[in-house]
A protein has these predicted regions:
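A short, exposed helix-loop element centered on a Lys and neighboring polar residues
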Residues: 1-13
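Structured, solvent-exposed acidic/aromatic patches
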Residues: 16-70, 74-302
Length: 302
């Protein structure tokens, strides 16, 4: 999804494929807009509404605090991407809203996570169908929610552990010491991790497949023109020096093409792709001479 594309943007020049101008350092505003919209509206608003509607009702105390912890988690992700965010004043439907500084966001996250985790009652109310931390019956596992909140505090403390002005190591140390004053309330094993069930294999079913595997292997023939490939820049930084990493990150030209069974001229050799959407073709208006090696290669060969 969008989040995976945002992550792979860090590897421009090393990784080429899918679509658009990914390998050219150009902006993809629609992807970032969608990520903001999904996180801010679709993830934060339901949690915010639970808190707003039920916070004064003691029968919903645990569920409200679970919503607060989840809200903190999503806000921490948004702050990691965009920095300043409307932490205090957002989600109320105001057209104009004040943003909080990134460093202040972290301080508020520490306080809100600690408060919510402390307020969770092991014998209190639960969600009957908890999608994140559920017990064997599917209901909220309160202990795991406590552990998640405290462990998230540790992760956020690491984010601010750099020396000033880029961090606050004194605050980070204080948070770590406070959390580890009771290590039993931190995530310590695989059993403590979240287990989400998003549906079937394909995206239309909310599948939790690996997007690269699904795109390049499961639906290879459907996506043959835009298969992900190793980038030209990375390839030609490695190839002249017989860099052993080349065989790990790249694959040679195929011995035989799946599409038509032909044997490529440069089978077994390594090349980097500079392709744009639709397979190799370069920039608009640029013609590749017949003696250029790329003129004989197709998307399968990179």
């Amino acid at each position: 999804g969008d989040l995976n594309r945002v992550v792979t943007f860090n590897y421009t020049q090393m990784f080429v494929g899918f679509q658009g101008r990914f390998q050219r350092y150009s902006e993809e505003p629609s992807t970032l807009i969608n990520y903001w919209r999904n996180a801010y509206v679709q993830c934060l608003m339901p949690a915010h509404d639970i808190i707003r509607i039920y916070e004064s009702n003691p029968e919903f105390s645990n569920r409200v605090n679970i919503a607060k912890i989840w809200k903190c988690y999503v806000l921490s992700q948004i702050a990691a991407v965009w920095g300043p965010i409307p932490y205090e004043y957002g989600l109320n439907g105001d057209i104009i809203v004040n943003y909080n500084r990134e460093q202040d966001v972290y301080y508020m996250l520490f306080d809100d996570l600690k408060s919510a985790a402390t307020a969770l009652d092991m014998e209190g109310d639960v969600f009957t169908k908890d999608p994140i931390f559920a017990d064997t019956s599917g209901k909220s596992d309160i202990l795991k929610w406590k552990k998640f909140a405290n462990t998230l505090r540790l992760r956020l403390a690491m984010r601010i552990s750099n020396p000033a002005p880029d961090g606050d190591p004194v605050k980070a140390q204080a948070v770590v010491e406070d959390v580890f004053s009771d290590e039993n309330l931190t995530m310590a094993s695989d059993d403590d991790t979240a287990l989400s069930h998003w549906g079937g294999l394909i995206s239309a079913e909310g599948g939790d497949y690996n997007p690269l595997y699904y795109y390049a292997v499961y639906e290879k023939q459907k996506n043959i023109g835009t298969l992900p490939a190793f980038g030209e820049t990375a390839c030609y930084h490695m190839k002249p020096y017989s860099d052993p990493r080349l065989k790990v990150y790249a694959q040679p030209v195929v011995d035989k093409k799946d599409s038509d069974g032909t044997v490529p001229v440069h089978a077994g050799e390594y090349f980097g792709d500079t392709a744009s959407y639709g397979g190799y073709g370069g920039e608009s208006g640029v013609t590749i001479p017949g003696d250029n090696v790329h003129s004989k290669l197709t998307r399968e060969d990179y």
